[in-house]
Amino acid sequence: MGPLIELGVPEVLAATVARAANFGIAASTWKTYSTAVRHISACSEDTGRNMSIPFSLADTLTFIGWLKLKRKVRSKTIKVYMAGLRMAHLCQGFNKVELGGDLVSHVLTGLEQEDRLRDKQMGKRDRMPVTLNIMKSLRINLRKMQWTLGRKRLVWAVATMAFAGSFRVHELLSHVKNRFDPTSTLLMQDISNSVGEGDSKKKVLKVFLKSPKEAKGKEGVVVDLFETDSYLCPVLAMEKYLRSLTFTASKASPVFRTSQGQGYTGVAFNSDLKVVLRNVIDWDKSKLTSHSFRAGLATELAGLGYSDQDIMALGRWRSDAYLHYVKTARTKRMKVVEEVTRKVLRGRKK
């Protein structure tokens, strides 16, 4: 609040403005800001340089060099910390933030090119999308795992939902296993079942996302997942998972939990994927994570000739495209999903 008063905001209004500014920042941004502040202190201690805000050009370049040399982070991560650094300046009242201009941009571009060259030399590739073939392999290998039925159904329910709904991993899963944020975590009260409209009697799983990226500042969005006549049906997978729970799940608890009742996290899901797909994916050369599911359906749709607009709508990559899509009648959307499922499974061109 102090920096706002220094800018000339009346003291009686400063608290209101500060509170509004805080609500305008996502929790992940606050986390990045906190991490950046800690790194500034560590960098200052390691280099013996007084890294005080506001940063000079030399401070910014020192910070970038320290992150690369000492923290061994990639260019993409450095850019994230730079965003946190800008936030640190804003929080201290420096609203006209200029962290180096063209020279810093040139250095960051060079680090990005260096990372790409190193990845190429090491045979590493970009993140793989989860394609239909990978989903088939995941299902087959899950059946062979010496896991409890509940654990298998948990992994498969997450996988089918992530694939069918192009969800971001933490739209479905907890960040940590022992606690959760009810304002962003998918809870039991956020999912419900209904029956299709018109002549369709197929089930619809309604998933309410409280804080999706494509609806910032709005009251969330509902993603409809439709029952399909295939092994990829997310509705059936969810029903089986819920039946396998060994405890009573309250409405205010996370949807996806382990048999011990702990939150199933994105890290845990990634770990399970590596185990189940160990004979399918060359993990030394390929990068497949929980986020790969988000690109999976889009990849299949592109291969079938769907337009960019359709893909952006179904995958929620563009807020205007998706919000236009969800305003269409549910019967029409169900037909779209049925058509997509049929073509994806049969591999026929549109």
Language-model features and meaning:
Residues M1-K350:
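Extended, non-catalytic subsegments within catalytic or DNA/protein-binding/adaptor domains
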